[in-house]
């Protein structure tokens, strides 16, 4: 859908797409059978090197980095938040829940971060309510926490006074899908976007997935929602 590219032109930021080893990231799920995990690829080191290279070549402000990724990429975003929390200003994992404790092999810092999670209630790969992650019969990725538990983990690391909840405007005229947002705005912003009847997808009016992925949600533009949080953080800080 090129949402990030269009938004970058409008807002004046740089979009960078990192490529994982053989199309996978070495995330926190210790049991996963893809080679990035089996070979313990140093994706944290890779991320740091890319940031330094971009700073050198483009003069970016390293204090304004947003990191987002979908599915395995979302799990890599969690790893960044766990292991190098201060290297990213805003973390935005898509269709990914935290792994359960006994399958989490990340070095967990328990440092508060800005976090925005986008998960679909009809996701058959990353189950919204937690459980076994299964893709085409491959169960090696193990079990994950629920979306609510994943959100609460990051929420409870921050200091906040109240939690907000709202139903976002209906924009695609499809009453079978909708989006709710729960968040806290305290020492950090932590948010959970629930894509009601959405599947293993990136939510946007500009993107359409096949039925295999569990259902489209067109009421929000995910890139725009992430950038709104970024703008609110810059005002807040």
Where are these regions (language model features)?
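Alpha/beta-hydrolase-fold serine-hydrolase catalytic core, especially in secreted/extracellular enzymes
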Residues: 113, 152-237
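Primarily recognizes the serine-hydrolase "nucleophile elbow" in alpha/beta-hydrolase
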Residues: 56-57, 62-113, 124
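Alpha-helical scaffolding within the catalytic cores
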Residues: 1-4, 98-107, 175-181
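Acidic catalytic loop of the alpha/beta-hydrolase fold
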Residues: 123-126, 200-202
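Soluble non-cytosolic domains of exported or imported proteins
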Residues: 37-45, 71, 82, 141-145, ...
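Short beta-to-alpha linker loops that shape the active-site pocket of alpha/beta-hydrolase fold enzymes
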Residues: 19-22, 97, 198
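Serine-hydrolase catalytic machinery in alpha/beta-hydrolase-like enzymes
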Residues: 1-66, 76-79, 83, 204-212
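Short beta-strand/loop motif that positions the catalytic acidic residue
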Residues: 117-119
């Amino acid at each position: 859908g090129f949402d990030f590219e269009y938004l970058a032109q409008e807002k004046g930021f740089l979009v960078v797409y990192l490529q994982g080893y053989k199309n996978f990231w070495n995330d926190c799920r210790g049991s996963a059978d893809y080679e990035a995990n089996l070979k313990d690829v140093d994706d944290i080191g890779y991320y740091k090197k890319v940031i330094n290279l971009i700073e050198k070549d483009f003069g970016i402000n390293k204090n304004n980095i947003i990191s987002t990724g979908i599915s395995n990429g979302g799990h890599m975003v969690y790893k960044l938040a766990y292991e190098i929390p201060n290297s990213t200003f805003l973390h935005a994992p898509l269709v990914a829940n935290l792994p359960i404790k006994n399958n989490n092999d990340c070095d967990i810092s328990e440092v508060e971060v800005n976090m925005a999670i986008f998960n679909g209630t009809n996701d058959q790969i990353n189950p919204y309510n937690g459980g076994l992650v299964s893709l085409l019969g491959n169960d090696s990725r193990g079990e994950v926490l629920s979306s609510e538990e994943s959100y609460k983990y990051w929420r409870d690391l921050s200091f906040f006074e109240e939690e907000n909840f709202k139903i976002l405007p209906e924009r695609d005229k499809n009453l079978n899908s909708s989006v709710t947002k729960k968040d806290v705005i305290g020492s950090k912003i932590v948010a959970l976007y629930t894509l009601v009847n959405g599947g293993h997808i990136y939510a946007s009016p500009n993107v359409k997935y096949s039925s295999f992925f569990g259902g489209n949600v067109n009421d929000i533009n995910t890139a725009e929602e992430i950038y709104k949080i970024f703008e609110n953080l810059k005002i807040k800080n």
